[in-house]
């Protein structure tokens, strides 16, 4: 779960993490295919939304933002200037995926927003840390993953390693 998409002029596709400068789909390419360009749309500076959706569906990975409506106060993709107007209805989302046991958040802001939706106060985990929590009687885990923004000071390889560890812990096959 991330935060909120960038402004429309920064989008290279109509799906989650649409900014070509964001490394999310490069991370997934490395984790599952050992190829950071796996989800790139040919030579275009764009990702292939259909290929991504097909992969996520086949792998059993859900993706959604933690925010439905927001104001980007500076007009950029920085979460530092993201004002949440309406968070995701977490109960409704989880009802649609009854087999979900693990949630990964991409960065601090997404983690903070998700934790704000829980009925009981839960301490903010450190990057890479996994914590158990209960939501509507359901036992889940939350892993705070590193942001895939290029502004986040961690190499692509280290980000991919963190995501690989998360997906392995969830029982998924990685490369």
Explain the meaning of each model-derived region.
Residues 6, 33, 68, 108, ...:
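Residue-level marker of positions within ordered structural domains that often coincide
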Residues 54-56, 96, 135:
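Generic structural signal for beta-strand residues in well-ordered domains
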Residues 36-37, 101-102, 122:
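Secondary-structure boundary/capping signal
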Residues 9-82:
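Short, surface-exposed acidic-centric catalytic microdomains
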Residues 29-36, 92-98, 172-175:
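Short C-terminal domain-edge/linker segments immediately following a structured domain
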Residues 58-117:
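Internal catalytic-core helix/loop-beta-alpha segment
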Residues 6-11, 18-20, 27, 74-91, ...:
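C-terminal capping/extension of enzyme domains
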Residues 1-3:
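N-terminal nucleotide-binding beta1-loop-alpha1 segment
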């Amino acid at each position: 779960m991330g935060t909120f998409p960038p402004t429309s002029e920064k989008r290279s596709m109509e799906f989650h993490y649409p900014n070509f400068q964001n490394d999310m789909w490069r991370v997934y390419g490395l984790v599952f295919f050992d190829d950071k360009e796996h989800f790139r749309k040919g030579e275009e500076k764009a990702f292939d939304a259909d290929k991504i959706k097909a992969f996520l569906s086949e792998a059993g990975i859900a993706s959604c933002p933690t925010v439905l409506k927001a104001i980007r106060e500076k007009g950029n993709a920085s979460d530092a200037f993201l004002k949440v107007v309406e968070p995701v209805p977490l109960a409704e989302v989880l009802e649609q995926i009854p087999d979900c046991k693990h949630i990964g958040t991409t960065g601090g802001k997404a983690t903070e927003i998700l934790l704000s939706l829980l009925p009981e106060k839960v301490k903010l985990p450190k990057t890479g840390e996994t914590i158990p929590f209960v939501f509507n009687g359901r036992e889940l885990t939350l892993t705070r993953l590193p942001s895939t923004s290029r502004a986040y000071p961690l190499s692509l390889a280290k980000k991919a390693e963190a995501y690989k560890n998360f997906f392995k812990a969830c029982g998924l096959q990685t490369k």
